[in-house]
Regions:
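Short catalytic helix/loop segments, enriched in acidic residues and glycine
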Residues: 25-37
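Conserved beta-strand segments of alpha/beta enzyme cores
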Residues: 29, 78-80, 132, 206-208
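Active-site metal-binding loops of divalent metal-dependent hydrolases
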Residues: 15, 112-113
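A short, conserved acidic/glycine-rich loop-to-beta-strand motif
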Residues: 129-139
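A structural signal for short hydrophobic beta-strand segments in well-ordered beta-sheet cores
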Residues: 30, 149-151, 209
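Conserved N-terminal catalytic core of the sugar/cofactor nucleotidyltransferase
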Residues: 2-10, 18, 36-110, 121, ...
Protein backbone atom coordinates (compact mmCIF):
# COMPACT_ATOMS: atom_id res chain seq x y z
CA UNK A 1 0.00 0.00 0.00
CA UNK A 2 1.42 3.39 -1.02
CA UNK A 3 1.55 5.96 1.79
CA UNK A 4 3.04 8.89 -0.13
CA UNK A 5 -0.32 10.70 -0.08
CA UNK A 6 -0.98 10.03 3.61
CA UNK A 7 0.08 13.01 5.73
CA UNK A 8 1.36 12.58 9.26
CA UNK A 9 0.52 15.13 11.93
CA UNK A 10 3.40 15.09 14.37
CA UNK A 11 2.46 16.69 17.69
CA UNK A 12 5.54 18.41 19.11
CA UNK A 13 4.30 21.54 20.84
CA UNK A 14 4.50 20.67 24.54
CA UNK A 15 6.78 22.08 27.23
CA UNK A 16 8.60 18.77 27.87
CA UNK A 17 8.92 19.52 31.57
CA UNK A 18 9.83 15.91 32.46
CA UNK A 19 13.06 16.21 30.47
CA UNK A 20 14.32 19.39 32.09
CA UNK A 21 16.99 20.70 32.32
CA UNK A 22 17.57 19.26 28.80
CA UNK A 23 14.54 21.13 27.44
CA UNK A 24 14.97 24.48 29.16
CA UNK A 25 16.51 26.01 26.03
CA UNK A 26 15.60 23.56 23.26
CA UNK A 27 12.35 21.73 22.37
CA UNK A 28 12.10 17.99 22.90
CA UNK A 29 12.32 17.34 19.15
CA UNK A 30 15.90 18.66 19.17
CA UNK A 31 17.12 16.62 22.14
CA UNK A 32 20.06 14.50 20.99
CA UNK A 33 19.50 10.76 20.80
CA UNK A 34 22.35 8.66 19.42
CA UNK A 35 24.11 11.85 18.28
CA UNK A 36 21.19 13.27 16.25
CA UNK A 37 18.08 15.31 17.07
CA UNK A 38 15.24 12.97 17.99
CA UNK A 39 13.07 14.35 15.19
CA UNK A 40 15.69 13.24 12.66
CA UNK A 41 15.24 9.63 13.80
CA UNK A 42 11.46 9.98 13.55
CA UNK A 43 11.69 11.36 10.02
CA UNK A 44 14.02 8.58 8.87
CA UNK A 45 11.64 5.98 10.27
CA UNK A 46 8.63 7.58 8.57
CA UNK A 47 10.52 7.83 5.28
CA UNK A 48 11.42 4.15 5.44
CA UNK A 49 7.69 3.41 5.86
CA UNK A 50 6.95 5.22 2.59
CA UNK A 51 5.62 8.44 4.11
CA UNK A 52 6.67 11.66 2.44
CA UNK A 53 4.55 14.41 4.00
CA UNK A 54 4.67 15.60 7.62
CA UNK A 55 2.86 18.49 9.28
CA UNK A 56 4.71 19.51 12.43
CA UNK A 57 2.30 20.89 15.04
CA UNK A 58 4.48 23.16 17.13
CA UNK A 59 4.30 25.41 20.15
CA UNK A 60 7.12 25.72 22.70
CA UNK A 61 10.32 26.84 20.89
CA UNK A 62 8.86 25.64 17.61
CA UNK A 63 10.80 28.21 15.59
CA UNK A 64 14.00 26.38 16.49
CA UNK A 65 12.63 23.20 14.91
CA UNK A 66 11.63 25.00 11.71
CA UNK A 67 15.05 26.67 11.50
CA UNK A 68 16.84 23.32 11.71
CA UNK A 69 14.59 21.12 9.55
CA UNK A 70 13.22 23.60 7.02
CA UNK A 71 11.17 22.04 4.25
CA UNK A 72 12.43 18.52 5.01
CA UNK A 73 14.24 18.03 1.70
CA UNK A 74 17.38 16.81 3.48
CA UNK A 75 15.32 13.88 4.75
CA UNK A 76 13.44 13.21 1.52
CA UNK A 77 10.31 14.64 3.13
CA UNK A 78 7.91 17.51 2.58
CA UNK A 79 7.56 19.25 5.95
CA UNK A 80 4.89 21.85 6.67
CA UNK A 81 4.37 23.74 9.91
CA UNK A 82 1.36 24.57 12.06
CA UNK A 83 2.05 26.80 15.07
CA UNK A 84 -0.23 27.00 18.09
CA UNK A 85 0.01 30.77 18.36
CA UNK A 86 -0.12 32.85 21.57
CA UNK A 87 -1.30 29.95 23.76
CA UNK A 88 -0.42 26.26 23.70
CA UNK A 89 -3.41 24.33 22.34
CA UNK A 90 -2.74 20.86 23.72
CA UNK A 91 -2.64 17.78 21.52
CA UNK A 92 -6.27 17.99 20.45
CA UNK A 93 -6.34 21.73 19.94
CA UNK A 94 -3.13 21.65 17.91
CA UNK A 95 -4.59 18.96 15.68
CA UNK A 96 -7.83 20.87 15.16
CA UNK A 97 -5.78 23.96 14.28
CA UNK A 98 -3.77 22.00 11.69
CA UNK A 99 -6.77 20.43 9.91
CA UNK A 100 -6.64 22.74 6.85
CA UNK A 101 -3.23 21.27 6.00
CA UNK A 102 -4.12 17.64 6.71
CA UNK A 103 -6.82 16.75 4.22
CA UNK A 104 -9.51 14.10 4.65
CA UNK A 105 -7.55 11.43 6.56
CA UNK A 106 -4.18 11.37 8.27
CA UNK A 107 -1.89 9.65 10.75
CA UNK A 108 -1.16 11.23 14.12
CA UNK A 109 1.96 10.54 16.17
CA UNK A 110 3.49 12.23 19.18
CA UNK A 111 6.72 14.18 19.24
CA UNK A 112 8.28 11.91 21.85
CA UNK A 113 7.39 8.53 20.31
CA UNK A 114 9.49 6.16 18.20
CA UNK A 115 7.13 3.57 16.72
CA UNK A 116 8.72 0.87 14.54
CA UNK A 117 5.61 -0.86 13.22
CA UNK A 118 4.06 -1.42 9.77
CA UNK A 119 2.28 1.84 8.93
CA UNK A 120 0.80 0.49 5.69
CA UNK A 121 -0.87 -2.34 7.60
CA UNK A 122 -2.29 0.20 10.07
CA UNK A 123 -3.64 2.33 7.21
CA UNK A 124 -5.27 -0.70 5.58
CA UNK A 125 -6.94 -1.63 8.87
CA UNK A 126 -8.31 1.89 9.14
CA UNK A 127 -9.76 1.81 5.64
CA UNK A 128 -11.52 -1.45 6.52
CA UNK A 129 -12.82 -0.48 9.96
CA UNK A 130 -15.75 1.72 8.90
CA UNK A 131 -15.15 4.26 11.66
CA UNK A 132 -13.79 7.82 11.54
CA UNK A 133 -10.95 7.20 13.99
CA UNK A 134 -8.63 4.35 14.90
CA UNK A 135 -6.23 3.89 17.81
CA UNK A 136 -3.39 1.40 17.62
CA UNK A 137 -2.83 -0.48 20.87
CA UNK A 138 -0.05 -2.65 22.25
CA UNK A 139 -0.35 -5.38 24.91
CA UNK A 140 1.86 -3.61 27.38
CA UNK A 141 0.68 -5.34 30.58
CA UNK A 142 2.10 -2.42 32.60
CA UNK A 143 5.67 -3.24 31.49
CA UNK A 144 7.04 -0.10 29.83
CA UNK A 145 4.42 2.36 31.02
CA UNK A 146 1.04 2.32 32.73
CA UNK A 147 -1.49 0.47 30.56
CA UNK A 148 -4.56 2.63 29.87
CA UNK A 149 -6.77 0.73 27.40
CA UNK A 150 -9.27 -2.11 27.78
CA UNK A 151 -9.34 -3.91 24.43
CA UNK A 152 -11.17 -7.15 23.58
CA UNK A 153 -9.27 -7.89 20.39
CA UNK A 154 -11.73 -6.03 18.19
CA UNK A 155 -13.12 -3.05 20.08
CA UNK A 156 -11.68 -0.50 22.47
CA UNK A 157 -13.95 -0.77 25.48
CA UNK A 158 -12.36 1.86 27.69
CA UNK A 159 -9.56 4.41 27.64
CA UNK A 160 -8.47 6.21 30.79
CA UNK A 161 -5.08 7.83 31.08
CA UNK A 162 -5.88 9.41 34.46
CA UNK A 163 -7.37 6.47 36.40
CA UNK A 164 -6.28 3.20 34.77
CA UNK A 165 -7.07 -0.13 36.47
CA UNK A 166 -6.03 -3.78 36.31
CA UNK A 167 -8.49 -4.63 33.53
CA UNK A 168 -6.42 -2.43 31.23
CA UNK A 169 -3.65 -4.58 29.78
CA UNK A 170 -3.16 -2.53 26.61
CA UNK A 171 -1.71 0.90 26.04
CA UNK A 172 -2.32 3.59 23.44
CA UNK A 173 0.63 2.87 21.12
CA UNK A 174 0.84 6.46 19.92
CA UNK A 175 -0.01 5.93 16.24
CA UNK A 176 -3.57 6.89 15.38
CA UNK A 177 -5.57 7.71 12.26
CA UNK A 178 -8.42 10.19 11.94
CA UNK A 179 -10.80 11.46 9.34
CA UNK A 180 -10.89 15.23 9.54
CA UNK A 181 -14.65 15.30 10.17
CA UNK A 182 -14.02 13.55 13.50
CA UNK A 183 -13.17 17.00 14.88
CA UNK A 184 -16.17 18.85 13.43
CA UNK A 185 -17.69 19.60 16.84
CA UNK A 186 -14.45 20.38 18.65
CA UNK A 187 -13.73 23.99 19.62
CA UNK A 188 -11.52 25.96 17.25
CA UNK A 189 -8.25 27.40 18.60
CA UNK A 190 -9.08 26.38 22.17
CA UNK A 191 -6.87 24.05 24.19
CA UNK A 192 -7.91 20.42 24.66
CA UNK A 193 -6.16 17.08 24.85
CA UNK A 194 -6.74 13.98 22.73
CA UNK A 195 -6.80 12.00 25.98
CA UNK A 196 -10.01 13.88 26.86
CA UNK A 197 -11.46 13.24 23.39
CA UNK A 198 -11.02 9.47 23.12
CA UNK A 199 -13.65 8.49 25.75
CA UNK A 200 -16.25 10.52 23.85
CA UNK A 201 -15.34 8.73 20.61
CA UNK A 202 -15.67 5.38 22.38
CA UNK A 203 -19.08 6.36 23.78
CA UNK A 204 -20.26 7.29 20.28
CA UNK A 205 -18.81 4.06 18.82
CA UNK A 206 -16.50 6.05 16.54
CA UNK A 207 -13.11 4.71 17.64
CA UNK A 208 -11.76 1.48 16.17
CA UNK A 209 -8.87 -0.45 17.70
CA UNK A 210 -5.96 -2.22 16.02
CA UNK A 211 -3.31 -4.22 17.87
CA UNK A 212 0.34 -3.92 16.88
CA UNK A 213 2.99 -6.36 18.10
CA UNK A 214 6.10 -4.16 18.04
CA UNK A 215 6.87 -2.41 21.30
CA UNK A 216 7.00 1.37 21.49
CA UNK A 217 9.88 3.64 22.50
CA UNK A 218 9.63 7.15 23.90
CA UNK A 219 11.77 10.04 25.10
CA UNK A 220 9.18 11.55 27.41
CA UNK A 221 11.28 10.55 30.42
CA UNK A 222 14.98 10.29 31.19
CA UNK A 223 14.65 6.50 31.38
CA UNK A 224 12.96 6.30 27.99
CA UNK A 225 15.56 8.60 26.47
CA UNK A 226 18.43 6.43 27.71
CA UNK A 227 16.72 3.26 26.49
CA UNK A 228 16.14 4.60 22.98
CA UNK A 229 19.66 6.00 22.79
CA UNK A 230 20.96 2.51 23.59
CA UNK A 231 18.71 0.94 20.92
CA UNK A 232 19.57 3.39 18.14
CA UNK A 233 23.30 3.19 18.72
CA UNK A 234 23.06 -0.55 18.05
CA UNK A 235 20.22 -0.57 15.51
CA UNK A 236 20.08 2.81 13.77
CA UNK A 237 16.88 4.17 12.27
CA UNK A 238 16.27 2.76 8.77
CA UNK A 239 18.17 4.47 5.99
CA UNK A 240 16.25 6.63 3.54
CA UNK A 241 15.13 4.63 0.53
Amino acid sequence: MCLEDWPVALLAGGLATRLRPLTEKIPKALVKVADAPFLAHQLRLLHAQGIRRVILCLGYLGEMIEAQFGNGAAYGMNIEYSFDGPQLLGTGGALKHALPALGDQFFVIYGDSYLPTNYAKVAQAFLSCGKPAMMTVFKNEHRWDTSNVEFDGKEILRYDKTNPDKTMQYIDYGLNIFRSDTFANCPGDKPFELAEFYPDLIFRNQLAGFEVKERFYEIGSSRGLAELDYLLRRSPAPAQS
